[in-house]
């Protein structure tokens, strides 16, 4: 009988190397004990994954392991080098730059460095910023002071910068503009990043995510400027105010906008080409310019946490004639509306008469205002196929029964609509 280990050893080296590539490098090295054939096979693995947590968060042992394995590694090119340091590690702070330099010398294509902030910032070598083979670069909790030097990422297509600190306000635009082939960009800002306005000018960019969630940002002068003519998907989350100006974004088909800006007219007025839109605003008064039509919008998700959110819903269903899917959900803690706030039902929108097929409401509470909105949609959505109502988990059995009774007895415009109470 042939043992399992023998059957595995009969596989070709290329196939085995692909399997080993997806394991932590610490586990890959253990395979060298299997047999003579396996003794040096690990040295040709094209993907190296180092994680401090797998070494019991012991810094010296981790640094020694990475040093030794990189020195013994013999693959002429590296598909990826992934370094994750989840706790403060003073020895690694000094060594990461050396490890990255080795990766650059091995023509690395994907580089990821994630670090838990320590007393000393991790500094990356200058050779990284002119690496011609790099296609994916992901950095977290890194200081990019050396980016003030010459920067040229001619092959870079994916760039993720999470909680990164820069030399000055011009460092980030300099990095972005150096990526002539960039298609995917993620920027998550952090306090003390030395940036006031994030400027994104990228002719080839297709997906963009911008996040600012820390309360350390204050004032209206922190924000984003976007000029991305080829962009298809955009995700903007800003919970601490500021602004976002879009100069050129005519081809966006999918957008997530979750912000607390007082005025979003310029932002939403620039993405009228969207087909899918997820929206959470603090106000509906200046959401988008009057007369705007979302002529391509077929899928809308609207957050119900803002006061008078129903007014924004009214505008959107009136201005989205092709809407097929409507989803309502409270994503954040709701700001209580004025006791006198009332909902003015709209004239019958085209989307309800001709297109809406799916209506879903998550975390439904059954308040008077919510019942008004839900019954209006059920009554007038003539082509509605499915309505799914999901109560809040904290709702009592009696409350759920009342919600079900109210909605089940309400008139329905579609004789084929299936009402599901999840």
UniProtKB/Swiss-Prot annotation:
LRR repeats lie at residues 59-85, 136-163, 164-189, 193-212, 214-238, 279-304, 305-330. Residues 342-391 form the FBD domain. Pfam families: F-box, FBD, LRR_At5g56370. PROSITE patterns: FBOX. It comes from Arabidopsis thaliana (Mouse-ear cress). InterPro entries: F-box-like_dom_sf, F-box_AtFBL13-like, F-box_dom, FBD, FBL13/AtMIF1-like, LRR_dom_sf, LRR_FXL15/At3g58940/PEG3-like. The keyword Repeat applies. This is F-box/FBD/LRR-repeat protein At5g56420. It comes from the Eukaryota. Keywords: Leucine-rich repeat, Repeat. The keyword Repeat applies. Residues 5-54 form the F-box domain.
């Amino acid at each position: 009988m042939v043992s399992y280990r023998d059957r595995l050893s009969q596989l070709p080296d290329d196939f085995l190397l692909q399997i080993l590539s997806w394991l932590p490098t610490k586990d890959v090295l253990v395979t060298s004990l299997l047999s003579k054939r396996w003794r040096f096979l690990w040295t040709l693995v094209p993907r190296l994954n180092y994680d401090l947590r797998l070494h019991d968060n012991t810094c010296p042992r981790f640094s020694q392991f990475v040093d030794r394995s990189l020195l013994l590694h013999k693959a002429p090119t590296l598909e990826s080098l992934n370094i994750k340091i989840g706790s403060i590690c003073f020895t690694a702070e000094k060594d990461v730059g050396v490890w990255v330099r080795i990766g650059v010398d091995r023509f690395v294509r994907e580089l990821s460095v994630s670090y838990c902030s320590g007393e000393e910032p991790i500094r990356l070598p200058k050779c990284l910023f002119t690496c011609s083979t790099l296609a994916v670069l992901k950095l977290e909790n890194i200081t990019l002071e050396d980016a003030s030097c010459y920067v040229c990422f001619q092959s870079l297509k994916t760039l993720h910068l999470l909680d990164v600190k820069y030399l000055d306000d011009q460092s980030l635009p300099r990095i972005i503009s150096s990526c002539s082939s960039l298609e995917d960009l993620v920027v998550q800002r952090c306090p003390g990043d030395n940036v006031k306005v994030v400027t994104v000018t990228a002719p080839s960019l297709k997906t963009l995510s911008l996040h600012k969630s820390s309360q350390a940002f204050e004032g209206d002068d922190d924000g984003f400027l976007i000029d991305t003519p080829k962009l298809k998907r955009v995700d903007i989350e800003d919970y601490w105010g500021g602004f976002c100006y879009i100069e050129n974004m005519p081809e966006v088909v999918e957008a997530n906008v979750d912000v607390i800006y007082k005025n979003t007219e310029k932002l939403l007025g620039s993405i009228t080409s969207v087909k899918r839109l997820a929206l959470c605003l603090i106000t509906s008064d200046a959401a988008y310019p009057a007369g705007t039509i979302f002529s391509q919008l077929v899928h809308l998700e609207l957050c119900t946490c803002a006061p008078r959110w129903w007014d924004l819903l009214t505008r959107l269903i009136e201005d989205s004639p092709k809407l097929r899917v409507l989803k309502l959900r409270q994503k954040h803690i709701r700001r209580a509306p004025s006791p006198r706030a009332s909902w003015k039902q709209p004239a019958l929108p085209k989307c309800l008469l001709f297109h809406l097929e799916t209506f879903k409401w998550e975390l439904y509470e059954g308040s008077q205002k919510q019942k008004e909105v839900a019954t209006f949609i059920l009554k007038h959505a003539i082509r509605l196929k499915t309505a799914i109502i999901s109560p809040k988990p904290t709702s009592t059995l009696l409350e759920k029964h009342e919600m079900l009774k109210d909605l089940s007895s309400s008139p329905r415009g579609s004789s084929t609509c299936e009402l599901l109470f999840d």
